[in-house]
Amino acid sequence: LYFEPVTVEDVLTIYEKEKPEGVIVQFGGQTPLNIAQALKDAGVKILGTQPEGIRLAEDREYFRERMIALDIRQPESGTARSLEEAVELGRQIGYPVMVRPSFVLGGRGMEVIYDEENLKRYGVEAIQVSPEYPMLIDRFLDNAIEAEVDALADGTDTFVATVMEHIELAGIHSGDSACAIPPVTIAPKHVRTIEEHAAKIARDFQVKGILNVQFAICDDEVYIIEANPRASRTVPIVSKVTGISMAR
């Protein structure tokens, strides 16, 4: 058992000493995903979803393109690399919008913006938007119901353990929202759509292991919010409720 920072240098030191079969990056939150490619480049064998598949989910622009190709509906969105681009995107999408920095942990910096003045304030004060620190802008789905799934996949087949319905409306970070298992108000047709979308994404990204996908249901349509090829905070809850040890 090691108590060390999750950095490339520290992981490599342990890897060289212990000589394991490989490294699993799915169970440490966002940080291991961020260093997966560097570990693979250093000769570490990555077990489960490969860094290439992880990048597909993490790169928001590429993710948007893949969702279009898979015919999965998503809120209108864009990536701004300057304050001017952010203002133009805000005008195109229409307010309110959901804004967040790219490549952050656990939804940090996420905010709902209702007008151009506050968008400018956010871009300057909150994240200092730039080519190195782009801003993600999505149409905010007002009064939407948020749903979430934890799935297991082997690159071909996908098993969705359950669909969770968030008690709070979409826009409240999932870490601050209670959820119901099984869903209470989500129509069966939407539950089926959510399960089908999760399976499509798992196959397309060649997920091997755990996949967490978040959805929003608005105006009788299912929208995808994001997909993360890793274990989420809900895995222990899902395992307890369903009696299925997802980590095992």
Residue ranges and their predicted role:
Residues 49-110:
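A conserved helix-loop-beta module that forms one wall/lid of the active-site cleft
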Residues 25:
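Redox-cofactor binding/interface segments in oxidoreductases and associated redox assembly factors
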